[in-house]
From Swiss-Prot:
Entry function: May function as iron donor in the assembly of iron-sulfur clusters.
One Gene Ontology cellular component: cytosol
Subunit structure and binding partners: Monomer.
Organism: Escherichia coli (strain K12)
Lineage: Bacteria, Pseudomonadati, Pseudomonadota, Gammaproteobacteria, Enterobacterales
GO biological process, one term: iron-sulfur cluster assembly
InterPro entries referenced in this protein's UniProt entry, alphabetically: ISC_FeS_clus_asmbl_IscsX, IscX-like_sf
Family per similarity comment: Belongs to the IscX family.
Domain of life, source organism: Bacteria
GO molecular function list: enzyme inhibitor activity; ferrous iron binding; iron ion binding
Protein name: Protein IscX
Length: 66
């Protein structure tokens, strides 16, 4: 079973693992959306995301980066 948009914690952690040298404060949502869809374990409709979901994922990524 793959990652879904509702798995914000797991996706944020996966982004941190995939891009450890990237400062999440500099990331655009359009780029982050693509990176999430490109994650090997991601298995959800790319069009099902929204700003609230991306913000939740970004907050986890920021927390991991600190």
């Amino acid at each position: 079973m793959g990652l879904k948009w509702t798995d914000s914690r797991e996706i944020g952690e996966a982004l941190y693992d995939a891009y450890p040298d990237l400062d999440p404060k500099t990331v655009r949502f359009t780029d982050m959306h693509q990176w999430i869809c490109d994650l090997e374990d991601f298995d959800d409709d790319p069009q099902a995301s929204n700003e609230k979901i991306l913000e939740a994922i970004l907050l986890v990524w920021l927390d991991e980066a600190e």
